[in-house]
Amino acid sequence: MAKTLSAAQANKEHVLAVSRDFISQPRLTYKTVSGVNGPLVILDEVKFPKFSEIVQLKLADGTHRSGQVLEVSGSKAVVQVFEGTSGIDAKNTLCEFTGDILRTPVSEDMLGRVFNGSGKPIDKGPPILAEDFLDIQGQPINPWSRIYPEEMIQTGISAIDVMNSIARGQKIPIFSAAGLPHNEIAAQICRQAGLVKIPGKSVLDDHEDNFAIVFAAMGVNMETARFFKQDFEENGSMENVCLFLNLANDPTIERIITPRLALTAAEFLAYQCEKHVLVILTDMSSYAEALREVSAAREEVPGRRGFPGYMYTDLATIYERAGRVEGRNGSITQIPILTMPNDDITHPIPDLTGYITEGQIYVDRQLHNRQIYPPVNVLPSLSRLMKSAIGEGMTRKDHSDVSNQLYACYAIGKDVQAMKAVVGEEALTPDDLLYLEFLTKFEKNFITQGNYENRTVFESLDIGWQLLRIFPKEMLKRIPASILAEFYPRDSRH
């Protein structure tokens, strides 16, 4: 009896709260559009507009659009319209202020579904039955409760696993350029990613049941979206993938919310459903250009190359939503893809991204032109969290030494190659010729591998040792004597 009473009481309180909220914040509708500027709509005579409030716009033809308040000045409000402003008539457009921020419905049922850039299903399936409605800006994670990423993810790609190991919970972008196979590399990582399986040690890896991919596309062409969708379907992982697609012909402004919707879904899957989520964001250059468009429409003071001065802060609000949290088994690993305009790594987008993220994977056009796949240049690539994710107990005790030595030999080989172009091969010393041989074999045997070739980290390390045996022991100065004694002999099997 007490139970029904409390339920009735709760119901009564709920009705009172709703009516009280409605009295204090009625959902007012305005017809006071004073101007349209690019993606922005300016409204006058608005009663108490709130920053970041969601506005529903009803056009003269009956279609609905949504927007967000960007700026408030007295009774004036500047609204950013996500679906674009084409067709908005200043006299006949109704604007309703909802009094709420932008929230997105989240549920475990989002896996296996395809959404547009605004989070609406576009796969002819039913609407999402929401378990919760979450703010798309996400909850800030207390730095004290973050866990340092220490479990290495094996991608099956030698250039990444040995030289630039990725840890679970890391954010590491792929720096690429137009026409390079960054999509193929990202798809291969999605197909092959898993924890390192150490021989003789049973690793309980719930990779199959507990792994999810959230893929957000911003301003990509139809071909790229089809490529990823088809790849996920072919390898049978589509039921563990959630896709958000903002294509090149979709509104530019929608690109600003697409990565945030994707990351909100990823946070729910990671921290509520305790899944290990891999988030692929492509293309961050399109996102930054959308940011520049809004900034220009608001007539803000531009920074480098016309991008807004707050672009660093804005990118950080996306990239920092990766990691692991104490008391939760899930994790978010981020691999944003960005295409460098004119192959320029000093461009503001890759430049600022490199400051925020924990390293980068650099896709090189010269390697690609020589038919090398994956064309990952290991010299400018970096993984800042590699040191804590490798070594004895995690991969193998020779891992960091082999990585350092391969890096050093490849760098010297590049210098020798440049010198050979000037002085000719006859003027080179025997040591120089060894470095040249190493350079060729490193690119041919170590970096080059098939699209579906999944090498374990141990196979990759063994290939590294085969290459290092080109040199006499005395020239391998980066490897301690104890490691050399164990691994350098040709008959050593590990």
UniProtKB/Swiss-Prot annotation:
One Gene Ontology CC term in the entry: proton-transporting V-type ATPase, V1 domain
Residues annotated for ATP binding in this entry: 384
TM spans (from-to): none
Alphabetical keyword list: ATP-binding, Hydrogen ion transport, Ion transport, Nucleotide-binding, Transport
Gene3D superfamilies (UniProt xref): 3.40.50.12240
MF terms (GO), sorted A to Z: ATP binding; proton-transporting ATPase activity, rotational mechanism
Statement: the UniProt record of this protein carries the keyword Nucleotide-binding: yes
Pfam families reported in the protein's UniProt record: ATP-synt_ab, ATP-synt_ab_N, ATP-synt_VA_C
Entries under InterPro entries matching the protein: ATP-synt_VA_C, ATPase_a/bsu_AS, ATPase_F1/V1/A1_a/bsu_N, ATPase_F1/V1/A1_a/bsu_nucl-bd, ATPase_V1-cplx_bsu, P-loop_NTPase, V-ATPase_su_B/beta
Gene Ontology process terms (BP): ATP metabolic process; vacuolar acidification
SUPFAM superfamilies reported for this sequence: P-loop containing nucleoside triphosphate hydrolases
PANTHER family: V-TYPE PROTON ATPASE SUBUNIT B
Physiological role: Non-catalytic subunit of the V1 complex of vacuolar(H+)-ATPase (V-ATPase), a multisubunit enzyme composed of a peripheral complex (V1) that hydrolyzes ATP and a membrane integral complex (V0) that translocates protons. V-ATPase is responsible for acidifying and maintaining the pH of intracellular compartments and in some cell types, is targeted to the plasma membrane, where it is responsible for acidifying the extracellular environment. Essential for the proper assembly and activity of V-ATPase.
Summary of subunit composition and partner proteins: V-ATPase is a heteromultimeric enzyme made up of two complexes: the ATP-hydrolytic V1 complex and the proton translocation V0 complex. The V1 complex consists of three catalytic AB heterodimers that form a heterohexamer, three peripheral stalks each consisting of EG heterodimers, one central rotor including subunits D and F, and the regulatory subunits C and H. The proton translocation complex V0 consists of the proton transport subunit a, a ring of proteolipid subunits c9c'', rotary subunit d, subunits e and f, and the accessory subunits VhaAC45 and ATP6AP2.
Similarity section: Belongs to the ATPase alpha/beta chains family.
The protein, known as: V-type proton ATPase subunit B
Organism: Manduca sexta
Lineage: Eukaryota, Metazoa, Ecdysozoa, Arthropoda, Hexapoda
Gene designation: VHA55
